[in-house]
């Protein structure tokens, strides 16, 4: 996959696949376990200081993709290269060093925090792992400085997670991820569990911290309006497959794939006149089973443009300009 960019290439994902074995019903004692392919043949690149938005319906493989990149689930095929090094070939000791540069912010802010630890201990935990030489006073100083940076008062350092709102808990999670100054943050739907008014605050905080610290972000969400606000490039996924990938301008203003068009039509427009006159593309049917996906194009069972060729051939993920990639026979 070719994308012209003068910035440093941090992450390269090539033909990544993640599969899980699914146990059959207990009555079928001799039946072989089925295979669920959560991520199939996904490729993209991430450059220094860039934000890649990953969007799609629930169950499309967004979070599994993120967890495979950081090593929380094992990839079954493909390559994950971090600064040119193959992550899948790394030992546990090498992974520990890599995770200094790659941190993650989780979807449920309260569930991701240890209820038995105060927030000072939570934020300081990465420092104790990666910088054990620091004194208690130095750790406290760094923690309080990071709390200020994410919008938390330092005098709250001894309080516990249950004493904070959802938005504040997410700020604690952000502080914990940033305390060791990583190069990349994977944000797994960081605002989906928050009120709309708080979502904008957290997204703007991430943008501000990205600019200040030179971070690269993988921002996973199902809200295309939020993704547009923060992303430089956008990857659209469906049933574990990459459907479309391009810059935010290309994906939002020159949408190619029928699935992306359907997602875009569901995004509300603040202008009442435009909202009243816009066309809505409704998807037919339900999301197919990932254990038994459709042949050919996985989206064909819900696509209004699908024909018999779509059932016979899986569309290649290709581009005409080396930046805007689409997996659709009707676009090629």
Curated annotation (Swiss-Prot):
Limits of the ABC transporter domain: 23-264
Topology of the protein relative to the lipid bilayer: Peripheral membrane protein
Subunit details: The complex is composed of two ATP-binding proteins (OppD and OppF), two transmembrane proteins (OppB and OppC) and a solute-binding protein (OppA).
UniProt-annotated location(s): Cell inner membrane
Record function comment: Part of the ABC transporter complex OppABCDF involved in the uptake of oligopeptides. Probably responsible for energy coupling to the transport system.
GO biological process: peptide transport; protein transport; transmembrane transport
UniProt gene name: oppF
Keyword terms, alphabetized: ATP-binding, Cell inner membrane, Cell membrane, Membrane, Nucleotide-binding, Peptide transport, Protein transport, Translocase, Transport
Species name: Haemophilus influenzae (strain ATCC 51907 / DSM 11121 / KW20 / Rd)
Protein's UniProt name: Oligopeptide transport ATP-binding protein OppF
Lineage: Bacteria, Pseudomonadati, Pseudomonadota, Gammaproteobacteria, Pasteurellales
NCBIfam families per the UniProt record, alphabetical: oligo_HPY, PRK15079.1
